[in-house]
Design a protein with these regions (language model features):
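Acidic glycine/aspartate-rich repeat arrays in secreted/surface proteins
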Residues: 2-146
Length: 146
């Protein structure tokens, strides 16, 4: 999508209709070093989700620098989860890469409180940066989902 509007509140934001209609729950410090292509296993990189937005931290966070690696990172168990007390991998999360924002959705239909990641959507929002939330209510700097 090349002209996504996320800068204003109320009805001005564009809405992305996704399968689950839900954002992923907050999570913190999930080890995602397995997403590094050619990594040796001793790297230090974790993912956290706040308001549906994934950020990486750790001394090797910069090694996750391709779309494929980012998708692998958000596919690690616990990054996308339904709720704080439900590990099912249901919902959408966003991340920024190379001047674009990506919305990635998992639809875990197992309903067994275990992460069974099933990526069903990867949506590129070309040129969109500064997103600080994924939500079902419009707000500034928010990807609006339904």
């Amino acid at each position: 999508i090349t002209d996504y509007q996320a800068a204003a509140a109320d009805a001005d934001n564009d809405t992305i209709d996704i399968i689950t209609g839900a954002k992923g729950a907050n999570s913190g410090s999930i080890d995602v070093k397995s997403a590094i292509a050619g990594g040796g296993g001793s790297e230090n990189v974790t993912a956290a989700v706040t308001n549906g937005v994934v950020t990486l931290s750790g001394s090797d966070a910069g090694l996750i620098n391709t779309l494929s690696e980012w998708i692998d990172a958000v596919s690690v168990n616990g990054v996308i989860k339904k709720a704080a007390d439900d590990a099912d991998a249901v919902g959408a999360v966003a991340f920024q890469l190379n001047g674009n924002t990506y919305l990635v959705e998992s639809n875990d239909t197992s309903n067994n409180n275990t992460a069974n990641v099933s990526i069903v959507n990867v949506i590129e929002l070309t040129g969109l940066t500064g997103v600080n939330a994924v939500a079902d209510a419009a707000a500034a700097n928010t990807i609006l989902i339904a």
